[in-house]
Amino acid sequence: MRLILLSGLLLLGTFLVNGHDADPEGEVLNSVLLTLMKLQKEFTNLFHAFLTVHKARSFGSGSERLYVSNKEIKNFEALKVICKQAGGQIPSPQLENQNKAFANVLERHNKEAFLVVGDSGNFTNWAAGQPNKADGTCVKADKQGFWHSTSCDDNLLVVCEFYFI
């Protein structure tokens, strides 16, 4: 989309620099301006459509964060790479509604998944007897959203967190 807009601006700039001799009626200039206005309107419509979908997803989960699984089963190190490549991060719920949205994904897939709790602020959701470093230095969430210490070598459901706006 940006490439098209930049191309239109380049064409418009070239036209203005070269003068109006090649297009005395201004047809090319009007055509370029009309195309740019259509593209701007289309971009605005796409942006509003994106916001509508985002708001609907947020409304349904009660969270401004989106938790998504690719259904793969991986260890913590592989999860870091996958989430980064996808443009997301390892889940780090900082509020109860975010943890619930995360737990909904786990319940739907009937699996457990890693999360990061170091930057979870004041919110925690440790299971009884947890954290227990003897179980491992990583943290997983069960299907109910309770947190447990676990080994980073465990293979769990890949879930990444995406934060919009």
Curated annotation (Swiss-Prot):
Query: Which positions make up the signal peptide?
Result: 1-19
| Calcium found in the keyword field | yes
Q: Which domain of life is it from?
A: Eukaryota
Q: What does the record give under GO molecular function?
A: carbohydrate binding; phospholipase A2 inhibitor activity
Instruction: Please state every residue range assigned to the domain named C-type lectin.
Output: 46-161
Under InterPro entries, the record lists: C-type_lectin-like, C-type_lectin-like/link_sf, C-type_lectin_CS, CTDL_fold
Q: What is its main location?
A: secreted
Entry keyword set: Calcium, Disulfide bond, Glycoprotein, Lectin, Phospholipase A2 inhibitor, Secreted, Signal
Instruction: Kindly list the places in or outside the cell where this protein is found, as annotated in its UniProt entry.
Output: Secreted
Q: Which cysteine pairs are joined by S-S bonds?
A: 83-160, 138-152
Tissue specificity: Expressed by the liver.
- GO CC terms for this protein? extracellular region
Q: Which residues are glycosylated?
A: 122
**Assembly description:** Homotrimer; non-covalently linked.
Please report which protein family the annotation says this sequence is part of: Belongs to the alpha-type phospholipase A2 inhibitor family.
Q: What does this protein do?
A: This phospholipase A2 inhibitor binds directly phospholipase A2 in the presence or absence of calcium.
Protein name stated in the entry:
Phospholipase A2 inhibitor B4
- Naturally occurring in which organism (per UniProt): Crotalus durissus terrificus
